[in-house]
């Protein structure tokens, strides 16, 4: 029971060594209670996130067993099952990745590389997605900018930011990717003209499983931005978000220049 509280024997002015030990004990119990609450919330969130796609798969599987279904219906139900199974697989994969990141089981393998080239490669991966929504993709960056980071982990960052931008930008909108360098480091921003975020959503956007309002809950599991935050912490980088409801969002990433090695875990 983490609600146990042991009172001290003396007032603040007359506290002795035993009182200090009691205060330390109470603080430890409070911290353990917080950890237990986080664990409980995590299990609850995972259960909820897995239950929803499993229910969808079950419902469509039952529909497929009906007689006299047209070929179009069978194809539609099959695609729905496949898409939902992919979401479930992504959820499990993200949970495992985030767990490894938070428990330091993934050690960054940093090297000096051209982040501009990496950004261009990541952007091109979403070409069919933005063209399908008739989104205008604007890119402003230098010919080359070197950073010292783990390429694979940084690719995870860019893919999350770009996929979110495409996902939340409406038909005919605009996505802008900017990069610039100065003496402090490299700054990359990803802006969109999508639905934007409320102040409360902005406050919690990097929390695990947080999806904000209904406009930010579609096709997601609330883990991507938590991973982005953790990866950038490992790289001694930072991320901030600027957004207004119905006015779009901008995510700004800052990274140290090549030659400035990040701190060891």
Residue ranges and their predicted role:
Residues 9, 109-114, 131, 136-146:
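Conserved catalytic submotifs in the C-terminal HATPase_c
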Residues 15, 32-70, 76-77:
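Membrane-proximal coiled-coil signaling linkers
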Residues 232-233:
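Detector for a conserved hydrophobic position within an alpha-helical segment of the HATPase_c
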Residues 83-88:
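Short alpha-helical segment of the dimerization/phosphotransfer core of two-component systems
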Residues 197-209, 229:
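Short conserved segment of the HATPase_c
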Residues 4-27:
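HAMP signal relay modules and closely related sensory coiled-coil linkers
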Residues 165-166:
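Short helix-loop "hinge" at the ATP-lid/N-box region of the Bergerat-fold HATPase_c
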